[in-house]
Amino acid sequence: MSAAGAHRGVTPEQTLARVRPLLPRLGITRIAMLTGLDVVGIPVAAAYRPNSRSIAVHQGKGATLAAAKASAVMEALECWHAEMLEPVLRLATAGEIVRHGDALDPVRLPLTGQVDPGTARLLWTEAADLGTGRPVWVPFELVSADFTVPAPAGFGVFRQTTNGLACGNARIEAVLQGVYEVVERNAVARWHAATPDAQAARGVDPASADGAASRWLLARFAGAGVAIRIWDVTTDIELPAFLALACDADGVAGVEPEFGAGCHADADVALARALAEAAQARVTRISGARDDFPQHSFDPAMRADRHAAAQSLRRSAPTRPFRAVRSQGSAEADLDHALRLLAGAGCAQVACADLSRPEFGIPVVRIVVPGLEGAWEGAAA
């Protein structure tokens, strides 16, 4: 297991060496280190793709400079793949597509609420059911990351995000990361939808975290005088998931308060991911170089509300200690474990669309799980 907490077959340095020749094809014009924009010191990088069809700036973080760079470039790479798809598609209603094989139930997927998914003619593409290995039709809108307009026929039914999009040096890495992400986004959305009392009941004492990865990150925040609040947002799926809030301890409206979230079979890794993402979110906000920030987020009144809400959350007392949960020992075992937990929570159907391109040779997938909430609308997707 790497310092970043995930099962990796190669080092970040090897990953960078592998993808560097691909940068021109991906449209990446530069990679920037943004760590020094903030006081925390957790490495954060950005990869820039000016002609992207989704977002033009991709962030990455890690325990080292190389890990942060690799994270940013791999995020750019997976988005490029999801933008440039050339699959076989069918335009059909949910009732029509099942004549051609198994299909996901559109009613159980994240909807815009603007169109009836039961009667709308949707674009469908084939994926694989990870539980059965059989082909399954998935709405193409939940696979594509081409956000350009006008949208194709059959779009507008689902919330189009990058949720479940993942890549890795091996296919198992990509699939596992995609599964973790959809579980994480579901957990965070459910926490935000809960009552204030229910949210507060999930508070975790940062001092009780005993894992090496999370302790190192917590020390960086503490040394910089940045307050951290943690919530255990694990759902009935029982895969450890955490939400972290980083905000200025004195409450002065300086750097925006930012959330980070993480999920993993190992609770320490899940918490470390949440903390690292909170650090990344701070740097991203400081840099201003993220093209999916909503315009209203820069409004002074909105910023004041965010600071007030963050301070209120920070002052609520933790109610539980960190609970260590260990991984299964390998990526393959962790994936089997995750699929069993999903099935036990009523989400047995886990679709995996393979977006890999032979000329790149890097596994890229999109995971779609009916029954899970999509990305919380208050966060970048």
Give the role of each language-model region.
Residues 1-381:
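Helix-biased "structured C-terminal domain" signature
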